[in-house]
Design a protein with these regions (language model features):
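Ligand-site clamp/hinge motif
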Residues: 219-263, 407-409
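Gly/Pro-rich hinge or "lid" segments in bacterial periplasmic/extracellular proteins
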Residues: 69, 89-93, 169, 175-226, ...
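Ligand/substrate-recognition segments at binding pockets and active sites
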Residues: 363-433, 512
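N-terminal lobe/hinge region of extracytoplasmic solute-binding protein
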Residues: 54-104, 197
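Detector for C-terminal structural segments
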Residues: 208, 212, 310-341, 345, ...
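Surface-exposed binding/hinge segments that line
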Residues: 103, 107-110, 146-186, 519
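Alpha-helical secondary-structure segments
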Residues: 128-135, 159-163, 200-201, 229-230, ...
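Periplasmic binding protein-like
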Residues: 52-54, 124, 245-246, 252-255, ...
């Protein structure tokens, strides 16, 4: 029945996809259609273009302005149209793009960056430190999707030197510099996001909103000339993306684990490892209320309950049954990152999980569900409406925890209520970024007046963990900060892992899957962050067709 259902959806999507391709007018010759080729050829007869599908949610609603999410938004990626000061390497260390050098003052409050003097925007104007300062001050003042509150001011010292004056030390600033695209001060106006001018590898050629975006190689790019000269991005749901591959109308089509067994003639399945994790919070603290929001949870406040849940989940089973094997076990929000602490890892041990619950006084009742002092071992595990993977993970979690005597009800919710409810009820989240700031955002005490003086997304307080993260931000270099981020996870005595407070349970990192046309060499991918979208074409300029 499952396969029949998939086939029906694909058949419908084929029809829809055909309508899309007619509407956007994909430039595919009859000969190419006959051979199932979407790629175009250059004047030498070599293919130099690709057609890539992405989820509809990947289309940048506000356009290509870094202040409003392009590159530096919720799902970080390289901005393509613009240059950045730094880059991240394959092993997630820091490299250089516009920057030729950078340093930080002894007190950590001033970053000095020198930039190349040979870079031009696509309108012919030279890119200078004034443009860099303008970009960052603009993001500080206007960004609604990224946190630039640590930046006090960016100042151009001369044409090739910019200083970033910080409100507090931020050793991981180079990771921010890797995703903020530099925009031209002289050409910036309210319409910039729709008609961007940059200095990156590609220029925006065409944007048919709701359908496609076409990029062309920047002929004046200062780096190595892109091997792929035209990139067409089609926005569609997974059903339609599969149909596009089956019809030969896409060279790279994003897909999901539920479609991974589909055989598409002329295509191979590419699985990219990620730190796109799924996990859920377990609120810590006694139940209290502030401003109409409930905080804490009488059941999950017990650290032995949290430890039992972490041990009692068979992540291998979950990956096999929910993700068709396309994922890796997650033990933190930052698995495989340079700042990851391997002490986070645990082995599935149902017997030990039961023992922890028993010793903590959680005894099975007549219906098999545990109780203690009138508190039932039960909670609701929320997931975002319409996300079938999160729903399946939530239901699998509920089934597994029932074997421990824990009752879990699952509920689809909207984000308009999920954030507040997560202060007292577990919510299945998706995280994963190329910066250790994600650890800070999840586990560090929120200093704002909102909430109860605990971590932002779920009640949790540990001053030692806070101190390590504060020290990490104040470190003399990003490399020196790694050990401190690792100690924040576990220092041998306290932390956020199994032997510590374990306020979050991490389940899996979801592989990003793509159907790739045979003959197309997709350059080696660095670990993808959260978001099955733009990351795949971070290095599209290095792809090539094998003739």
């Amino acid at each position: 029945m499952k396969k029949k259902c998939v086939c029906k959806r694909v058949a419908a999507a084929l029809l829809a996809a055909g309508m899309i391709f007619s509407a956007v007018g994909c430039r595919t010759t009859e000969a190419e259609k006959e051979n199932g080729h979407a790629a175009e050829q250059d004047k030498n007869g070599e293919k130099d273009s690709v057609v890539v599908t992405m989820p509809t949610t990947s289309e940048p609603e506000a356009g290509f302005d870094p202040a409003y999410g392009w590159g530096a938004g919720e799902h970080t990626h390289e901005p393509l149209i613009q240059s950045t000061l730094t880059t991240t390497t394959a092993d997630l260390k820091i490299g250089k793009d516009l920057a030729t050098d950078y340093s930080v003052s002894e007190d950590g409050l001033t970053w000095t960056v020198t930039i190349r003097d040979d870079v031009k925007f696509t309108d012919g104007e030279i890119l200078t430190a004034e443009d860099v300062a303008f970009t960052y001050n603009h993001c500080r003042d206007e960004s609604t999707v990224s946190d630039f509150t640590m930046l006090k001011e960016a100042v151009a010292i001369d044409a090739t030197t910019v200083e970033f004056h910080m409100d507090h030390p931020c050793s991981i600033w180079p990771y921010t510099m890797a995703v903020v695209g530099i925009i031209p001060e002289h050409a910036y106006d309210e319409g910039y996001g729709q008609n961007p001018i940059g200095s990156g590898r590609y220029v925006l050629k065409q944007w048919d909103k709701g359908q496609q975006i076409i990029f062309e190689a920047n002929p004046e790019y200062y780096g190595e000339a892109p091997k792929i000269r035209q990139v067409t991005v089609l926005f569609m749901e997974e059903d339609a993306a599969l149909a596009a591959a089956m019809a030969g109308q896409a060279d790279v089509a994003h897909t999901a684990a539920s479609y991974s067994e589909q055989q598409v003639k002329g295509y191979e399945l590419l699985a990219v490892q990620t730190v796109d994790n799924r996990g859920f919070n377990l609120p810590v603290g006694e139940v209290t209320e502030k401003d109409g929001i409930t905080y804490g949870n009488a059941f999950t406040n017990d650290v032995n309950v949290r430890r039992a849940i972490n041990l009692g989940i068979d992540r291998d089973e979950m990956i096999e049954n929910v993700l068709n094997g396309y994922g890796t076990k997650a033990y933190s929000v930052c698995d495989k990152m340079p700042w990851y602490n391997e002490d986070c890892e645990v082995e599935y041990d149902q017997e030990e999980a039961v023992r922890l619950l028993e010793e903590a006084g959680w005894k099975a009742g007549a219906d098999g569900i545990r109780e203690k002092a009138g508190v039932r071992a039960a909670f609701t595990l929320m997931f975002s409406n319409g996300d079938s993977v999160r729903q399946a993970l939530a239901e699998d979690t509920a089934n597994q925890l029932k074997e421990l005597g824990i009752e879990v009800k699952t509920e689809g919710v909207g984000w308009d209520t999920a954030y507040d409810r997560a202060q007292s009820e577990p919510l299945l989240w998706g995280w994963g970024a190329h910066t250790p700031m994600e650890l800070y955002n999840i586990y560090h005490t929120d200093a704002s007046e909102e909430g109860i003086g605990a971590a932002r997304y779920s009640p949790y307080i540990n001053e030692t963990v806070d101190n390590y993260m504060d020290e990490a931000l104040a470190a003399s270099s990003v490399e020196d900060s790694y050990e401190l981020w690792q100690k924040a996870q576990w220092d041998g005595t306290t932390g956020i892992i199994q032997e510590g407070d374990i306020p979050w349970i991490w389940l899996c990192n979801i592989d990003h899957l793509y159907f790739v046309r045979e003959g197309l060499h997709v350059a080696e991918q660095k670990i993808h962050p959260h978001g099955h979208g733009w990351s795949i074409i971070n290095n599209v300029d290095q792809w090539n067709w094998e003739m």
